[in-house]
């Protein structure tokens, strides 16, 4: 068996990626989220495939087809809620995965990090077009508002919006093309995730100490396969509790009414995992400025390898940077809360302050903290 595992062209790839892969001996539970993201992607592709068998992407029947899935299809309600809440699980794992990358300095693997940012953009795009598909009230207005942001692009903006809509508003053409995008994007994500892994295995994994671990590596199997399996088991337990007991807790009640172009919901807001970016978008009183800030809120991650000033890779032994990191986490939670609130005082000023803090901490404060740490340690 060992001979085939190491010699057969196909099993050799799997062997080098998941079995005989040399892994640092001290990576903690924060390193479990990569495999959990893989699990989420597989879950979403399979539940999505079964939903697509019964869904119709027509404005007249989209909402009814989702209702039909929940009422008439065997276990349709379960598949639908697993898919809807699976997106939330995906983003929870994604944000923790990125946070771990920032905390332990994993962004210094530039290729892996940049492909990760591309994966984040693609996942956000997939989640957005997917949210439009049930053609509920919040789906319709969310699609209208977010696609309309493109009209802020000078000169070609309005034409671009109408080109994406396939008409003069969100209609049948929009729904059909969004369904097509929603179906194809996860497979592109899966392909990119493989490339992400390929680049990671070129350098090997980072570890909590942020120091080379070449001297003490251990095989991935059985140590980390077991650990990943335990992580998956815990995540599935929490996930199924959410799906079976509180399936509609993370959704928007407005989405249980069919889309109506004549009736606007009181507060148009996206799903919870986009609220921080939505708050940054709304905190700038200019349309184009808001769109630029929205894109920069994610793109700023690409600058991290270039503004890393510390002589230590990880934040494990850098208390000032740790304080800033957790301040950033609190700031993002604050932005998430603000994104779900109406645009009125005092929320406007809180949102603007939190947005400014977000960029200040990442671009200025973290770079300065690294320099201070170097100075204090006389490095």
UniProtKB/Swiss-Prot annotation:
Cofactor detail note: Binds 2 heme b groups non-covalently.
InterPro entries tied to this protein: Cyt_b/b6_C, Cyt_b/b6_C_sf, Cyt_b/b6_N, Cytb/b6-like_sf, Cytochrome_b, Cytochrome_b_C_euk/bac, Cytochrome_b_N_euk/bac, Di-haem_cyt_TM
UniProt-annotated binding residues for heme b b566: 97, 196
Additional observations: Heme 1 (or BL or b562) is low-potential and absorbs at about 562 nm, and heme 2 (or BH or b566) is high-potential and absorbs at about 566 nm.
Annotated protein name in UniProt: Cytochrome b
SUPFAM superfamilies, A to Z: a domain/subunit of cytochrome bc1 complex (Ubiquinol-cytochrome c reductase), Transmembrane di-heme cytochromes
Residues holding a ubiquinone: 201
Bilayer-spanning residue ranges: 33-53, 77-98, 113-133, 178-198, 226-246, 288-308, 320-340, 347-367
Oligomeric form and interacting partners: The cytochrome bc1 complex contains 11 subunits: 3 respiratory subunits (MT-CYB, CYC1 and UQCRFS1), 2 core proteins (UQCRC1 and UQCRC2) and 6 low-molecular weight proteins (UQCRH/QCR6, UQCRB/QCR7, UQCRQ/QCR8, UQCR10/QCR9, UQCR11/QCR10 and a cleavage product of UQCRFS1). This cytochrome bc1 complex then forms a dimer.
UniProt KW keywords: Electron transport, Heme, Iron, Membrane, Metal-binding, Mitochondrion, Mitochondrion inner membrane, Respiratory chain, Transmembrane, Transmembrane helix, Transport, Ubiquinone
Keyword Transmembrane assigned: yes
GO CC annotation, single: mitochondrial inner membrane
Similarity section: Belongs to the cytochrome b family.
Membrane topology summary: Multi-pass membrane protein
Entry annotated with the keyword Transferase: no
GO molecular function: metal ion binding; ubiquinol-cytochrome-c reductase activity
Disulfide bonds: none
Stretch forming the signal peptide: none
Domain of life where this protein originates: Eukaryota
Species for this entry: Thomomys umbrinus (Southern pocket gopher)
Entry function: Component of the ubiquinol-cytochrome c reductase complex (complex III or cytochrome b-c1 complex) that is part of the mitochondrial respiratory chain. The b-c1 complex mediates electron transfer from ubiquinol to cytochrome c. Contributes to the generation of a proton gradient across the mitochondrial membrane that is then used for ATP synthesis.
Record localization: Mitochondrion inner membrane
Any Pfam family: Cytochrome_B
One annotated GO biological process: mitochondrial electron transport, ubiquinol to cytochrome c
Binding-site list for heme b b562: 83, 182
Cofactor(s) needed: heme b
């Amino acid at each position: 068996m060992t001979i085939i595992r190491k010699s057969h062209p196909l099993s050799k790839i799997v062997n080098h990626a998941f079995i005989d892969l040399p892994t640092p001996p001290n990576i903690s539970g924060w390193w479990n989220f990569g495999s959990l993201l893989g699990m989420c992607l597989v879950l979403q592709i399979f539940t999505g495939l079964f939903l697509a068998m019964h869904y119709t992407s027509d404005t007249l029947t989209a909402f009814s087809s989702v209702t039909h899935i929940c009422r008439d299809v065997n276990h349709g309600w379960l598949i639908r809620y697993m898919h809807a809440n699976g997106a939330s699980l995906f983003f929870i794992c994604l944000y923790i995965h990125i946070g771990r990358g920032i905390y332990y300095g994993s962004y210094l693997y530039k290729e892996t990090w940049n492909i990760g940012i591309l994966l984040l953009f693609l996942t956000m795009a997939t989640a957005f077009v997917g949210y439009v598909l049930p053609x509920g009230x919040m789906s319709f207005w969310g699609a209208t508002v977010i696609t309309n942001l493109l009209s802020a692009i000078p000169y070609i903006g309005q034409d671009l919006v109408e080109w994406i809509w396939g008409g003069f508003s969100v209609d049948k053409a929009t729904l059909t093309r969004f369904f097509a995008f929603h179906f194809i994007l996860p497979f592109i994500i899966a392909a990119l995730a493989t490339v992400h892994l390929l680049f990671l295995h070129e350098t090997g994994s980072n570890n909590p100490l942020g120091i080379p671990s070449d001297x003490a590596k251990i095989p991935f199997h059985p140590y980390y396969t077991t650990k990943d399996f335990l992580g998956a088991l815990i995540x599935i337990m929490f996930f199924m509790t959410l799906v079976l007991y509180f399936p509609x807790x993370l959704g928007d009640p407005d989405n249980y009414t069919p889309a109506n172009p004549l009736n606007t919901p009181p507060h148009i807001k996206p799903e919870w995992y986009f609220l921080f970016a939505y708050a940054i978008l709304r905190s700038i009183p200019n349309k184009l400025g808001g769109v630029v800030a929205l894109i920069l809120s994610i793109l700023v991650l690409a600058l991290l390898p270039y503004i890393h000033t510390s002589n230590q890779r990880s934040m494990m032994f850098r208390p000032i940077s740790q304080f800033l990191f957790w301040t950033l986490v609190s700031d993002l939670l604050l932005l998430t809360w603000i994104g779900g609130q109406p645009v009125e005082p005092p929320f406007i000023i809180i949102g603007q302050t939190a947005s400014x803090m977000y960029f200040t901490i990442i671009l200025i404060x973290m770079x300065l903290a690294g320099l201070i740490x170097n100075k204090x340690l006389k490095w």
